[in-house]
Design a protein with these regions (language model features):
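Juxtamembrane intracellular "pre-TM" segments in multi-pass secondary transporters
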Residues: 1, 198-226, 422-429
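Extracytoplasmic gate region of multi-pass secondary transporters
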Residues: 25-29, 144, 148, 221-273, ...
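Helix-to-loop junctions at the C-terminal end of transmembrane segments
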Residues: 56-69, 272-285, 374-375
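Cytoplasmic membrane-interface "Motif A"-like loop-to-helix N-cap segments
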Residues: 67-78, 281-295
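Glycine-rich segments within core transmembrane alpha-helices of 12-TM secondary carriers
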Residues: 131-156, 356-367
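C-terminal membrane-cytosol helix-exit motif in multi-pass small-molecule transporters
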Residues: 151-160, 183-203, 400-405
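C-terminal transmembrane helical hairpin of 12-TM major facilitator-type secondary transporters
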Residues: 284-337
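A late C-terminal transmembrane helix in Major Facilitator Superfamily
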Residues: 342-378
């Protein structure tokens, strides 16, 4: 029972910490833009600050995850992130939001991300990596959908019955309620994390062991291939942030219905991630990823051409939900490549930090690029160009998977160093 309680805790912590910086923009983008008075370009630049700070934090975060208790690292991160929401609720300007997102780039990554990945890998064991990461991603999807549904209810509560008649003040009040919901959720989850995660940590016997992983992983081709896969997959995930805006500007929905469409998509996440995890364990994580990229290439190409008229509307909805499934399938298994690539367990944090450092660089470039794509051609033209950009990224992902498969045919064990002297000790209070 405690084993599954641990995974449930990791699931909720792993999703709630990203609620403030990402859920607010993914599910409520039209409302956020109106409430803050931002353009797509300005919001994209704010996200670029987050991405820059996160990129700096990923690699040292991996080293810390190999040294310190996941319980301590996750708890501090959740509290620090939740506190930042109280500042967001004051509606700072673009500079204030840029500083806040830079702060979140540190609080959500430095002490959190690699620790989460390491804890999940250890939970799964060598035989069930696809299942472990599939359950993590799928469970995070359930948590995201549940909190998005609750947040939509909060937004609707404060909005007038006819959302199109909402005043600026009503919209700001409603969105403030959404922000505070995610803030308190992060803090409450921090308390649960401290109570439910065992207080164990890994302790090295010298300063050499602290930086040993950082020194060796950068020369491993398999690490770079996995990082490139994450870049392409994460662009697809970031692409989901546009769907609520697409629903409003192209499909003619109001803000609440646009947010609801994205929330419905989030409910696909657990099914897609868990299914992909089981397939990866029985078949291959890399081949599962290749199939997912192929599906995305087709769906993005269709969305770049489809018009919301007659049967075209059905084509759009079908491809939207298929793309949700393929993106979440990718996220469910790309960290299972740690085991498929035979990554030594003592280097899990360092490799996770390295592939995240490189793989999540779309946090820096994706939103500024796509924000400018949308603003350059307002309306359906901008959104079609947006999907065309995503199709190109998916095609690149297919080629990267082919490269990874070729690397895996070599003797991967020979590419890794031997384990330095490390001990396991319980955390002292």
């Amino acid at each position: 029972m405690s084993r599954y309680l641990l995974m449930i805790t990791l699931v909720f912590a792993g999703e709630i910490i990203f609620g403030l910086p990402f859920h607010t923009a993914r599910f409520f983008r039209p409302t956020l833009l109106e409430a803050f008075g931002f353009t797509n370009t300005q919001l994209g630049d704010v996200f670029a600050v987050y991405g820059f700070m996160a990129m700096i934090a990923y690699f040292p975060g991996g080293v810390l995850a190999d040294r310190f208790s996941a319980r301590s690292l996750l708890t501090v991160s959740l509290i620090a992130t939740g506190v930042g929401g109280f500042y967001m609720a004051t509606y700072p300007g673009t500079w204030g939001m840029a500083l806040l997102y830079g702060y979140w780039g540190v609080t959500t990554i430095l002490l959190f991300w690699a620790a989460l990945i390491r804890a999940t890998r250890e939970w799964g064991g060598s035989a069930s990596q696809g299942r472990a990461f599939g359950i993590l991603e799928g469970g995070r999807g359930i948590a995201a959908a549940l909190f998005a549904t609750l947040a939509i209810a909060v937004l609707a509560w404060y909005m007038p019955e006819d959302v199109t008649l909402a005043s600026d003040e009503e919209r700001r009040t409603a969105f403030r309620g959404v922000i505070l919901l995610y803030s308190f959720a992060a803090i409450v989850t921090a308390v649960l994390t401290w109570v439910l995660i065992p207080p164990l940590k890994h302790v090295g016997d010298s300063s050499r062991s602290l930086f040993h992983g950082a020194a060796v992983v950068t020369t491993r081709p398999l690490v770079w291939a996995q990082a490139a896969i994450i870049i392409c997959a994460y662009c697809g995930y970031k692409g989901l942030d546009n769907y609520s805006l697409y629903a409003v500007q192209v499909l003619g929905m109001d803000e609440v219905k646009g947010a609801t469409l994205s929330a419905y998509g989030a409910y696909i996440r657990p099914f897609a991630a868990v299914a992909a995890g089981f397939v990866a364990d029985r078949w291959s994580a890399s081949k599962t990823i290749g199939v997912s990229f192929s599906v995305l290439l087709i769906t993005y190409a269709m969305l770049s051409m489809a018009l919301p008229e007659g049967s075209g509307l059905s084509v759009i909805y079908a491809n939207i939900f298929v793309s949700f499934f393929a993106v979440f399938a990718l996220r469910g298994v790309y960290f299972a490549l740690l085991e498929e690539n035979r990554t030594p367990s003592f280097l899990t944090g360092a490799v996770a930090g390295m592939v995240s450092f490189v793989g999540y660089t779309p946090e820096i470039f994706f939103a500024p690029i796509t924000g400018r794509i949308l603003d350059a051609s307002p309306g359906i033209g901008g959104h079609q160009n947006y999907f065309l950009f995503l199709a190109v990224v998916a095609a690149i992902g297919i080629f990267v998977v082919a490269w990874l498969l070729r690397l895996q045919r070599s003797d991967t064990r020979a590419q890794w160093p031997r384990k330095p002297a490390l001990d396991m000790e319980p955390e002292t209070k």
